[in-house]
Amino acid sequence: MQQRRPVRRALLSVSDKAGIIEFAQALSARGVELLSTGGTARLLAEKGLPVTEVSDYTGFPEMMDGRVKTLHPKVHGGILGRRGQDDAIMEQHHIAPIDMVVVNLYPFAETVAREGCSLEDAVENIDIGGPTMVRSAAKNHKDVAIVVKSSDYDAIIKEMDANEGSLTLDTRFDLAIKAFEHTAAYDSMIANYFGSMVPAYHGESKEAAGRFPRTLNLNFIKKQDMRYGENSHQQAAFYIEENVKEASVATAQQVQGKALSYNNIADTDAALECVKAFNEPACVIVKHANPCGVAVSTSILDAYDRAYKTDPTSAFGGIIAFNRELDAETAQAIISRQFVEVIIAPSATEEALKITAAKQNVRVLTCGQWAQRVPGLDFKRVNGGLLVQDRDLGMVSEAELRVVSKRQPTEQELRDALFCWKVAKFVKSNAIVYAKENMTIGIGAGQMSRVYSAKIAGIKAADEGLEVKGSAMASDAFFPFRDGIDAAAAVGVSCVIQPGGSIRDEEVIAAADEHGIAMIFTDMRHFRH
């Protein structure tokens, strides 16, 4: 469908001024008459562009501190008027057709994100005229182009040049979709904000406000269609949040390899989020969303070597994440040793990419460096509903630990305990992690009873010939019985770190004392389902 409409008159009114001067100059150079409002009009005039203020065009001034600017029949009639059908009535009322509307909206999200933002501040940043023009233009996309993203400016000028100043219906329809997505996201933000403010509005505590709105509106953008979902009979796609501020699998750039699968993305997310927990050079190997090997060291090469030794069998076909740049030596070690689905790191050297390119099926992602973790929400779909909670960003410091056993942990035991506690947070419950000298030596994941996770971790260590004696054990939740401690003692664990909080804590602590095990309570649980 290539029905073209020439662009002879455009209305520009933007809060985000990025690229607007160059775009307006390009339109004007192509003979497009410019209408504009407020700050946008002043900016264009300062740059010497011929621009007509909307208030001059309508004969009606802006009023109420700018609350009323474009809500006028000469504006909306010019946008909504159907060419060839409403021409006579437009002429009768001196309404000129407006062929393009360039609008982005008041920065509501940025306003409410500011510390100390009041309800009054938020209200004044709710755009009224902008969304109205956007929706009007999108509704009449058969005749009008609506532009809400500055990233479209260049493509629009190129198409106008290729079509003698016109845009095709296909383009106008695509722009209309973006416009409706834009206003839907905008209204969702406002609804979420107001919904979360209900307790505070009614005089309840500030802590009750700002948490979970009574209606949750979510907006995600499709990044890619998948060949299939978790299983081949399921269809799937990958959607991402807009303006993600933290390095993530959603923002990562794939620099090599074939398209990511549904399971690749899920596992890569698990690996990356785990490796972010460490400051030292670290490697995390994940299989089926569970870490199967984790280590920190003085280099990522040594960290990889030690993580791999935890469970070479499970590492086959796994996902590998690093918190440092992927170098050639480490890339060569991986490619020479194992089959890997995905490697993700903040960056990769050219030499490393040349090495991984030798294996066409290896996907390499770079995600950039990360700093502080960004609070957000986690979701779990249930039939007919959605469970929503804060991201689990909790982590205890050494100063917050409580030693509850008779024996104090040694410095090395304490380091190992904190290390495997970080890992346990990312293992499916019931989770047990054995670690020694900053590497995992056995991981028991996803068992229905905690004691069996402990037994499996010991079996895995024995299968790989790893020395458990003198190791630390982490449990993501409390031990309901002493049997888990007895199982750990049987294979030589000398230090246990766990949340505590069981009604049988005394019994569990007594078991640790019987075996000469140092026991540390974190008072923080990390269930992961």
UniProtKB/Swiss-Prot annotation:
Q: Which keywords does UniProt give here?
A: Hydrolase, Multifunctional enzyme, Purine biosynthesis, Transferase
Is Nucleotide-binding among this UniProt entry's keywords? no
BP GO terms, sorted: 'de novo' IMP biosynthetic process
Domain (MGS-like) spans 1-148
Pfam families membership: AICARFT_IMPCHas, MGS
Cellular component annotations (GO), alphabetically ordered: cytosol
Q: Which reaction does it catalyse?
A: (6R)-10-formyltetrahydrofolate + 5-amino-1-(5-phospho-beta-D-ribosyl)imidazole-4-carboxamide = 5-formamido-1-(5-phospho-D-ribosyl)imidazole-4-carboxamide + (6S)-5,6,7,8-tetrahydrofolate; IMP + H2O = 5-formamido-1-(5-phospho-D-ribosyl)imidazole-4-carboxamide
- Please give the CDD domains that the UniProt record associates with this protein: IMPCH
Q: What pathway is this protein said to act in by its record? A: Purine metabolism; IMP biosynthesis via de novo pathway; 5-formamido-1-(5-phospho-D-ribosyl)imidazole-4-carboxamide from 5-amino-1-(5-phospho-D-ribosyl)imidazole-4-carboxamide (10-formyl THF route): step 1/1; Purine metabolism; IMP biosynthesis via de novo pathway; IMP from 5-formamido-1-(5-phospho-D-ribosyl)imidazole-4-carboxamide: step 1/1
**Its Enzyme Commission number?**
2.1.2.3, 3.5.4.10
Write down the InterPro entries for this protein, in alphabetical order.
Answer: AICAR_Tfase_dup_dom_sf, Cytidine_deaminase-like, MGS-like_dom, MGS-like_dom_sf, PurH-like
Instruction: Tell me the GO molecular function terms.
Output: IMP cyclohydrolase activity; phosphoribosylaminoimidazolecarboxamide formyltransferase activity
Q: Name the PANTHER family on file.
A: BIFUNCTIONAL PURINE BIOSYNTHESIS PROTEIN ATIC (PTHR11692:SF0), BIFUNCTIONAL PURINE BIOSYNTHESIS PROTEIN PURH (PTHR11692)
What's noted about domains in the record?
Answer: The IMP cyclohydrolase activity resides in the N-terminal region.
Q: Which family does it belong to?
A: Belongs to the PurH family.
Q: What is this protein called?
A: Bifunctional purine biosynthesis protein PurH
Query: Could you tell me which species this protein originates from?
Result: Salmonella agona (strain SL483)
Gene symbol of the encoding locus: purH
